[in-house]
Amino acid sequence: MKNKHRKLSLGFLLTITLLCSITPAALAKTRQNHLIDFLYDNQNTDGTFGIAYQDTAYAIEIINYFNAYSVEVLFEETKSVDIPTFKEFLINQIQTMFNVENIDLYELLYYLDTLNRMESLETSLGSTLHNNIYRYLNETNQIGGGFAPTNTSTTANMVSTFFVYNIYAIIGESVVNQTGHKTWILSCNNTDGGYGGNPSLSSTIVTTYFAVYLFDALGDVNDLVNKTKTLEYFKSFYIDDPDNIGNFGGYLPDFLAYNTLLSSTYYCVKGIELIDESELNGGTTVNWVLNHQNFLDGGFGDWVEGNEQRGSSVSASFYAFKLLETFDSLEVLNEDIFAVEFNYLMLIIILSISGVIIGIIYLFIRRRRI
């Protein structure tokens, strides 16, 4: 009898050990699942996402790509975007801008982009609102080229020019005086090959990408002041040292920085892609991106100084998504991740199964005694 009890006890311990090993794998989720969960964890009560004005558009683009507008989660309420209600919210936000005459071009583009992904602006925007937007954009046009951030400003900058051009494009309108705008963009060129926010400012990765993007959209990147030098400007931020763990494959945000960022890598990669995509290091950069996924929350993030963990954000996750898309590598997000942390769900499952096993053993022993 004692041998039987000993065997049953041993079997029970082996079963528990097996459950502890198998349960994490059984509950493992793909990189994509982790990412979508992270986005919904950052959904606000009004239906928006994240904390920055661009976060909602970024989240909806990812959700739309994976058709994840409704996601069922074990032991939790369904996570979803109420499309009709959210479309109404977005239209109201845009309408309010014009009602109070306080138009923010940066927010406007992201509202329009989000709305357009859920329903074409041709049917959702309405002719009156469309015409108000078009008229306001025309009022930001500068005689010397470029666009100002408001219709009362008389100074163009690269950022507002980029946003105005994209608003024209998303509402289906053409940009007038393209030659004048291209001439103004060229005036922002600097000797390092980059482009500043206006003719008097130093180059930055973002404004240089905007300049290249606009030239590609308005004409041809070959018309840049010096295409080769601009290409070298982007490439100069690349970390090609395999011993530089954590940065190998990424791009620095500036020459004084120590850590590569998802945002700077995105702008450099997209700029290089427009000039000469053969100069990209796809495999290395994709691996670098994947190493930036944080499985504590499922999102992507950059290193935070003084903290061993990455700080995930909706914006950083979007840059990671777009980088993988650029290299046709989004399928890697279907990869199962088995390094799932032990959590309460696993504990409940293991304890429940253990309880059933203990109950069976108890009944078996009791019946044997009878």
Please provide the spans of the model-predicted regions.
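Secretory targeting signatures
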Residues: 1-30, 59, 102-105, 115, ...
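Hydrophobic transmembrane signal anchors and adjacent membrane-proximal interface regions, especially
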Residues: 3-8, 12-18, 51, 71-73, ...
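Intrinsic disorder/low-complexity segments enriched in polar/small residues
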Residues: 3-8, 44, 120, 174
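Low-complexity, intrinsically disordered short peptide segments enriched in small/polar/basic residues
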Residues: 13, 19, 70, 80, ...
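An alpha-helical repeat/solenoid feature that recognizes helix-turn-helix modules
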Residues: 17, 48-75, 96-126, 146-178, ...
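Long, well-ordered core segments of solenoidal/helical folds
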Residues: 29-47, 76-101, 125-151, 175-194, ...
